[in-house]
């Protein structure tokens, strides 16, 4: 038997390697035996005094990337960790084995047969993963959004009447066969899905559903070969989203991934992948990845609408508005001091409430999540029309309500709900459009004049800055909030 000296499950692997090495007298053969026995997710880098010049590597579900230079080989769980050494990388698939030594990498399948792997060249360097003069990564990434959105749009919008997504050209005619669509993700990406699903259904008439990835596998989704499933993940490694993707593929769905990290697991397993072009996002709280996800999901909805022959004047107006988004966000960022002032309302509060309707509801969910993540202020987001069904009992003198009303067809309804909170003593910060101002609110910010379907992208930026400055007032580490990780690679 073996005596254990720690409480980590990884020690099991060490003892199993020892056990099988004694049988096989070969470290690679021992590792092949080990990976057929262990269960769960793992990324293994094994070194031994028996062959000290080699590193033996294997993975299942967990991310692992390998880099190679002329005189060195490196491995890490994420691309930025190795960009100081090389931009040429390999992505290991589940149950594959890599053996690293100086300047050389060999790859094998789980049975020991040699295999060839293609090199992927990463299109950015590690300078993009530095603070670049900003105090924090989060603030830097908020300010990078105009550029990130422009890069995400580059080559995908032609003139004023055409969306180009060559990643989906192979299924251009297949969109006519889908009778439903699912959008699946976790956290911030799920909020992007709520907007994307709303837009797709609005533009195409395809019945569209959203589901949190951790629930998708267990709700027995009624999906089949006539279902399109869209999976969104910044890292492309989110374990719950990966598991949901695999279930959808088992059921015959057409799967589309939206990811930011080139060569990530989700992007490799999905039938088709559309990349956001946000560049590396280091802060745990997502900002530029979120707004570029919104952009890609908007482009997806418009591309499918185009494939179905649904172009009209509204369609052309939206395309014209898309091109203006980077400049509008530049202008919003010039009002940063205004949003820092809005954050001062949160200094001594333990609770705040966000309200909106339709697309604005998805936006306030994300705004509330940002505040919770980085400032640890309890924040709840509600559909404005649901206030009277319970949540309004929480509103009292001095409560803070952050309201978003950017959809002209329902803004009057939201404004009525805002007045209800004011009557009960709430202080209201309102983000709205010209002509929808409300009396007696504490603060009003008028957003640029764009098509309502685009407002989610714009209003996200002030909400991010409010969360950022509220965290600063409370002395919180915005880049590394407590109990959170950038990429959640366990279920």
Region roles according to the model:
Residues 49-52, 62-64, 69-73, 79-82, ...:
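Short, glycine-/Ser/Thr-/acidic-enriched flexible segments
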Residues 1-135, 144-179, 218, 330-333, ...:
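Conserved short alpha-helical segments that host acidic/polar catalytic motifs at enzyme active sites
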Residues 176-310, 315-324, 404-447, 466, ...:
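Glycine-rich phosphate-binding loops that contact phosphosugars or nucleotide phosphates
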Residues 36, 145-149, 153-182, 262, ...:
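Active-site phosphate/pyrophosphate-binding segments
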Residues 57-66, 134-138, 149, 183, ...:
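Conserved phosphate/anionic-ligand binding catalytic regions in large, soluble enzymes, centered on
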Residues 112, 440, 450-491:
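Generic C-terminus detector
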Residues 13, 44, 61, 98, ...:
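A residue-level signal for conserved active-site and pocket-lining positions in enzyme catalytic cores
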């Amino acid at each position: 038997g073996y005596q254990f000296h720690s409480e980590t499950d990884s020690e099991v692997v060490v003892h199993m390697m020892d056990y099988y090495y004694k049988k096989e007298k070969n470290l690679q053969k021992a590792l092949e035996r080990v990976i057929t026995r262990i269960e769960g997710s793992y990324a293994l880098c094994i070194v031994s005094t028996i062959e000290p010049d080699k590193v033996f590597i294997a993975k299942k579900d967990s991310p692992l990337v390998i880099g190679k230079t002329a005189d060195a080989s490196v491995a890490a769980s994420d691309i930025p960790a190795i960009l100081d050494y090389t931009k040429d990388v390999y992505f290991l698939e589940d149950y594959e084995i890599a053996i690293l030594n100086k300047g050389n990498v060999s790859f094998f399948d789980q049975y020991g047969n040699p295999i060839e792997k293609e090199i992927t060249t990463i299109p950015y360097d590690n300078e993009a993963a530095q603070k670049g003069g900003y105090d924090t990564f989060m603030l830097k990434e908020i300010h990078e959004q105009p550029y990130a959105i422009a890069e995400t749009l580059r080559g995908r919008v032609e003139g004023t009447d055409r969306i180009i997504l060559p990643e989906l050209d192979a299924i251009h005619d297949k969109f006519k066969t889908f009778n439903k669509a699912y959008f699946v993700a976790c956290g911030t990406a799920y909020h992007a899905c709520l907007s994307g699903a709303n837009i797709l259904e609005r533009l195409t008439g395809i019945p569209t559903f959203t589901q949190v990835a951790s629930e998708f596998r267990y709700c027995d989704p009624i999906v089949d070969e006539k279902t399109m499933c869209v999976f969104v993940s910044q890292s492309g490694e989110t374990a719950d989203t990966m598991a949901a993707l695999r279930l959808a593929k088992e059921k015959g769905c057409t799967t589309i991934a939206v990811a930011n990290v080139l060569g990530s697991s989700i992007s490799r397993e999905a039938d088709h992948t559309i990349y956001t072009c946000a560049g590396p996002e280091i802060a745990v709280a997502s900002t530029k990845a979120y707004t570029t996800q919104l952009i890609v999901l908007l482009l997806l909805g418009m591309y499918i609408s185009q494939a179905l022959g649904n172009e009209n004047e509204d369609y052309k107006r939206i395309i014209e508005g898309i091109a203006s988004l980077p400049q509008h966000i530049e202008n919003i960022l010039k009002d940063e001091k205004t949003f820092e002032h809005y954050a001062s309302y949160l200094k001594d509060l333990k609770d705040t409430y966000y309200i909106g309707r339709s697309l604005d509801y998805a936006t306030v969910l994300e705004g509330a999540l940002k505040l919770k993540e980085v400032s640890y202020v309890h924040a709840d987001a509600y559909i404005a029309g649901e206030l009277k069904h319970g949540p309004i009992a929480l509103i009292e003198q001095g409560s803070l309500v952050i309201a978003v009303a950017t959809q002209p067809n329902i803004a009057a309804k939201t404004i009525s709900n805002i007045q209800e909170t004011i009557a009960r003593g709430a202080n209201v910060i309102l983000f709205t459009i010209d002509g929808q101002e409300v009396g007696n609110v504490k603060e009003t910010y008028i957003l640029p004049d764009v098509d309502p379907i685009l407002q989610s992208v714009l209003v996200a930026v002030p909400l991010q800055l409010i969360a950022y400055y509220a965290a600063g007032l409370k002395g919180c580490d915005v880049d590394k909030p407590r109990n959170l990780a950038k990429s959640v690679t366990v279920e």
